[in-house]
């Protein structure tokens, strides 16, 4: 039995809305590093039954991959209380994945929302200035 949930454009929003803590593995069948990360992700899902571990097949769900700007796979994203708090491409080793989950569990989401609001306010004030030099 798998401990992960296959996410599609049909169930993605509801899964993220209904669950406080969702990990998302963006992957594809042809991707070698994705196949290496798969068992690590499954093991983490079994070790953390209180969290939702979702998988997005970027070949079957290109709209979801595009919506999140996924350009490299595998990419791991963590969404807490509907806020993306972590996103990183690459197959994380088991110890690194465990560490990231632990750090995400410890986040003070009130502080995170405050920081996001401040960033959005700053971006609004700066307009396109932040685009220079890229």
From Swiss-Prot:
Keywords: Cytoplasm, Disulfide bond, Electron transport, Redox-active center, Transport. Residues 3-106 form the Thioredoxin domain. GO terms for cellular component: cytoplasm; cytosol. Disulfide bonds join 31-34. Residues 117-134 have a biased composition (Low complexity). PROSITE patterns: THIOREDOXIN_1, THIOREDOXIN_2. Signal peptide: none annotated. It is found in: Cytoplasm. GO terms for molecular function: protein-disulfide reductase activity. CDD domains: TRX_family. It comes from the Bacteria. Induction: Expressed from 2 promoters, 1 of which (trxCp1) is under control of SigR. Dramatically but transiently induced by the thiol-oxidizing agent diamide. In an rsrA mutant expression is constitutive and uninduced by diamide. Residues 115-134 are annotated as: Disordered. InterPro entries: Thioredoxin, Thioredoxin-like_sf, Thioredoxin_CS, Thioredoxin_domain. Its main location: cytoplasm. Belongs to the thioredoxin family. Component of the thioredoxin-thioredoxin reductase system. Participates in various redox reactions through the reversible oxidation of its active center dithiol to a disulfide and catalyzes dithiol-disulfide exchange reactions. This is Putative thioredoxin 2. It comes from Streptomyces coelicolor (strain ATCC BAA-471 / A3(2) / M145). The lineage of its organism: Bacteria, Bacillati, Actinomycetota, Actinomycetes, Kitasatosporales. The gene is trxC.
């Amino acid at each position: 039995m798998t401990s992960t949930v296959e996410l599609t454009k049909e169930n993605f929003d509801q899964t993220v809305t209904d669950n406080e803590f969702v990990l998302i593995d963006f992957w594809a069948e042809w991707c070698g590093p994705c196949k290496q990360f798969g068992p690590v992700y499954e093991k983490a899902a079994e070790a953390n039954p209180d969290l939702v571990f979702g998988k997005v097949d970027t070949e079957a769900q290109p709209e979801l991959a595009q919506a999140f700007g996924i350009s490299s796979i595998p990419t791991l994203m963590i969404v807490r209380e509907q806020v993306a708090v972590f996103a990183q491409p690459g197959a994380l080793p088991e110890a690194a994945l465990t560490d990231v989950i632990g750090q995400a569990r410890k986040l003070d989401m009130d502080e995170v929302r405050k920081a996001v609001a401040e960033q959005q306010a700053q971006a609004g004030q700066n307009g396109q200035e932040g685009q220079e030099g890229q």
